[in-house]
Design a protein with these regions (language model features):
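Eukaryotic intrinsically disordered, low-complexity regulatory linkers and tails enriched in Ser/Thr/Pro
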Residues: 1-70
Length: 70
């Protein structure tokens, strides 16, 4: 799946994992792939970041080709 992050940069590599981490008062999502890590988005709470992560995996299970981060 292709992922468009909040800056609308496209991630075209197969990712190994998606991480949720806290930076200051925000929670960030990042994709880890062979060769690096790409920032996906910033959210005001852990619950919101987790909702987005679940939505992304639902899109993958529907075999959608592109997912745009909210």
């Amino acid at each position: 799946m292709y992922i468009l992050n909040q800056e609308k940069n496209c991630i075209v590599k197969e990712f190994i994992s998606i991480n949720i981490y806290r930076e200051g008062v925000f929670f960030n999502l990042s994709a880890v792939y062979n060769g690096g890590e790409e920032w996906l988005g910033e959210y005001p709470s852990y619950d919101r970041a987790y909702e987005v992560l679940q939505d992304m995996f639902k899109a993958m299970s529907r075999k959608e080709h592109t997912y745009e981060m909210p």
